[in-house]
Amino acid sequence: SIKKKITNDYLISQPNLENLAYAYQISKIYKVKEKIFIKAINTFKGLPHRHEIFLKKNKITFINDSKATSFESTKYALKNNKNIFWILGGLPKIGDKFNLKGVSSNIIKSFVIGKKTNYFKNQIKEKIKYKISFNLKNAINDVFKELLLKKNSPATILFSPASASYDQFIDFVD
């Protein structure tokens, strides 16, 4: 199976596998050799700050999804990862509602940052565990404290703010 030959972490999440299946079918139509297709896929780099896996170590995956500035854009990452420690917060989009149905079981705990912590707390408080961390530095420290309690359990550290972060950062790169 071609799936076993794909080693690119970015592309092996469920939605990307679907896209990959389409790309593979198109490559067959255009008679691209499988070896060339596999090489291209395994060297493909996704867009920075879009579900960017920037570190995998000791069963812990670190994902920067800082371009996710609404709940809908964050939901992709919540749906396709497990054992999530979710860092979120900032300036929410007007009318954005957090429907955690189908994703809450993937989240171990969330860490809320930014100036609008009450907004986020009210969106998630009866659905998932949370802690108000106020800023990214505190959130990272809080996540690592939780990881120490989990001792070698697989985990995903997800920075996917579900909002704009102009209250804390110059831009999504900062």
How should each PLM-predicted stretch be described?
Residues S1-I6, I53:
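Acidic-glycine-rich active-site phosphate/pyrophosphate-binding loop
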Residues D9-I107:
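Nucleotide phosphate-binding/pyrophosphate-handling subdomain across enzymes
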Residues Y30, I132-S133, Q168:
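A structural signal for short, well-ordered beta-strand elements
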Residues S70, N135-A139, D171:
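Alpha-helix N-cap recognition
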Residues S73, Y119-F120, Q168:
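Phosphate- and divalent-cation-binding pockets in alpha/beta enzyme and binding domains
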Residues K97-A155:
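C-terminal helical cap/extension that packs against the catalytic core
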Residues I157-A162:
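Short beta-strands and strand-loop turn motifs
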Residues Y166-V173:
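Glycine/threonine-rich flexible loop motifs
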